[in-house]
Amino acid sequence: TEKGMRAVISTNGTLITKEKARELKAINLSYVGISLDGAEEIHDKFRGVPNSFKKALEGLENCKAEGLKVGLRFTINKRNVVEIPKVFKLLRELEVPRICFYHLVYSGRGSEMIKEDLNHAETRSVVDLIMDETRALFDAGMPKEVLTVDNHADGPYVWMRMLKEDPKRAEEVFQLLQYNEGNSSGRGIGCISWDGKVHADQFWRNHTFGNVLERPFSEIWDDPNIELLHKMKNKKAYVKGRCASCRFLNICGGNFRSRAEAYYGDEWAQDPACYLTDDEIRRPE
């Protein structure tokens, strides 16, 4: 854009007609991420709208026809986890270059979404499956950009697998993870909602730190008197439980504080979605 910002959208894709795709291209949109919840039957059931799957794929193809970079978005939960192999099949058949698999992020005390999340063993199995499917695509000469998002335990887990399968590259992976520093909610990531409210990220909207219609974003973001936001700049000093003693804290960043608050009622408690074992996170003596 003229301001030097990269503009992207996440959408269900159903309203992206050929004309709308041309408009998105004309405004120099960088990327369009289209959400799928599985193959046709499951997707339409999730959305509660007949033919939403077909319309999503039509939107995807319309974007591709205009030369827009596209990708798929898939949020993992108990009801659609079995669809992951089918989604990889779609990735191949539709020649889509990118897919993001999102772990559930629940926020707000008593969140109903907690019961939709996988248990730790299921999550480990899913991450292994995603890595296996990604490797199979690469070996078949169809490399794709495959991301897992919103659970920073994935980084250490991938690294530990790399140690077994490719020790030489494992060191490179570890360095990249250290550089990334894991979760950056309230530090490197922020959210401004449609009405100007400022949040630590797009999930944690039950905490509002100010409004850009009333005060400049920079003043809100760097205000030391906004206690929670100020502490988010240095989470490692405040996290508790397993997070506080974890050897991967520097590359995970303490994961999501919103999940900790939703599950335990304490934003500084350990993230309940961390599936690494006590032995795996134990610091060497």
Where would I find each of the regions flagged by the language model?
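A structural signal for short, well-ordered beta-strand segments and their strand-loop junctions
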Residues: 71, 98-100, 145-149, 191, ...
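Short, acidic, Ser/Thr-enriched surface-loop or helix-capping motifs
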Residues: 93, 192-193
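Short, small/polar residue-rich loop motifs at catalytic or cofactor-binding pockets
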Residues: 183-187
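Radical SAM/AdoMet-radical enzyme domain recognition
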Residues: 1-125
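Cysteine-cluster motifs in flexible loop/terminal segments that predominantly coordinate metals
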Residues: 237-285
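C-terminal accessory region of radical SAM enzymes
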Residues: 121-172, 197-253
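A structural motif corresponding to the C-terminal lobe/cap of the Radical SAM core domain
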Residues: 93, 112-144, 178-182, 266-282
